[in-house]
Amino acid sequence: MFGATQSTNRMNDFEVASPPDDSVSALEFSPSTVQKNFLVAGSWDSTVRCWEVEQNGATVPKSMKTMGGPVLDVCWSDDGSKVFVASCDKQVKLWDLASDQVMQVAAHDGPVKTCHMVKGPTYTCLMTGSWDKTLKFWDTRSPNPMMTINLPERCYCADVEYPMAVVGTANRGLIIYSLQNSPTEYKRQESPLKYQHRAISIFRDKKKEPTGCALGSIEGRVAIQYVNPGNPKDNFTFKCHRTTGTSGYQDIYAVNDIAFHPVHGTLVTVGSDGTFSFWDKDARTKLKSSETMDQSITKCGFNANGQIFAYAVGYDWSKGHEYFNPAKKPQIFLRSCYDELKPRIN
């Protein structure tokens, strides 16, 4: 799919032009409703940027906006004409790409950690999760939320695949919501992982119905959790993003992000160890491990048809300020990935 453009990447993946000045905190491709591929990235430098991705792998910077604080999440409107941007300034802004205008559409009492578009047959809204311990649902034409749900703790991660939403909170809380008619709590449980979770992603079954989620923790481990497991053994955890050090001890790194392939249903994890790995959860096997980057991988995502995998390389502060090297700049890479993520054939 991609032609030969220059790259400094050891795997010859394609480097995105004009990346942010600080680590990437959010990375989302445009939805399938848009003919071309656009990529949006939010960063700790308080910017959100948009690129057009061409067929040969080249990226064309289209626009950039600066928010009132570090960006923690982004999501696209269902028609691909707008981008919602959640920030540490306690607001969510709507960025209209055609007019290049920005307006506030949501607010919390603390930094907004997650934003997701909910598109059901009877309503469309924006779901926002915050460190103020609330989950809010917004009709973006109105200044007040349609609904506010109090969470037991701060929202750390979330995902939406209609009619399901899932929220991971501080203190290892996991809450599943049904979005049919209106958002209602369906199930609440403690995380199967012993350590703080950082990433969550919903997966679908063969009928394309959302049936569970993958949850990643700072302890190099992922849990595959079905909402209603046919067999308790369907739920399992696996180790990842670990290396055996010279002394024989294991170095354990955080799972920073998880994404499911939109066609194959296989998944990718990215970590503080500077690698990504492709997995087949049904065969319970690893499909591929990447080379190790010289910094952590902070975020990742697939484009709508599953041809392109994007991942962001940058420091995630997992080793504290003494390991921060200002000479190492953030980078975003694109990889042609469709065949590599095909499920294992038994």
UniProtKB/Swiss-Prot annotation:
Disruption phenotype: Larval lethal. Larvae die at the third-instar stage. RNAi-mediated knockdown in the testes results in male sterility likely due to defects in primary spermatocyte nuclear integrity, meiotic chromosome condensation, segregation, and spindle morphology. These defects lead to a failure to complete meiosis but several aspects of spermatid differentiation can still proceed, including axoneme formation and elongation. RNAi-mediated knockdown in the developing wing or in the proliferating cells of the developing eye, reduces their organ size. Head (at protein level). WD repeats lie at residues 17-61, 64-105, 126-148, 255-289. It is found in: Cytoplasm, Perinuclear region; Nucleus; Nucleus envelope; Chromosome. InterPro entries: G-protein_beta_WD-40_rep, WD40/YVTN_repeat-like_dom_sf, WD40_repeat_CS, WD40_repeat_dom_sf, WD40_rpt. GO terms for cellular component: cell periphery; chromosome; cytoplasm; Nebenkern; nuclear envelope; nuclear pore; nucleus; perinuclear region of cytoplasm. Changing residue 129 to D: Male sterility. Spermatocytes display various defects during early meiotic stages, post-meiotic stages and late spermatogenesis. GO terms for biological process: cell differentiation; cell division; hippo signaling; male meiosis I; mitotic cell cycle; negative regulation of synaptic assembly at neuromuscular junction; positive regulation of G1/S transition of mitotic cell cycle; positive regulation of gene expression. GO terms for molecular function: RNA binding; ubiquitin binding. Keywords: Cell cycle, Cell division, Chromosome, Cytoplasm, Differentiation, Meiosis, Mitosis, Nucleus, Repeat, Spermatogenesis, Transport, WD repeat. Probable component of the nuclear pore complex (NPC) which regulates the nuclear export of specific mRNAs and promotes cell cycle progression during mitosis and male meiosis. Acts with Nup98-96 to promote the nuclear export of specific mRNAs such as Moe, however it does not appear to be required for general nuclear mRNA transport. Essential mitotic and male meiotic cell cycle regulator with roles in many aspects of the cell cycle including chromatin organization and condensation, spindle assembly, chromosome segregation, and maintaining nuclear structure. Interacts with hiw; the interaction with Rae1 may protect hiw from autophagy-mediated degradation. Interacts with Nup98-96. Belongs to the WD repeat rae1 family. This is Protein Rae1. It comes from Drosophila melanogaster.
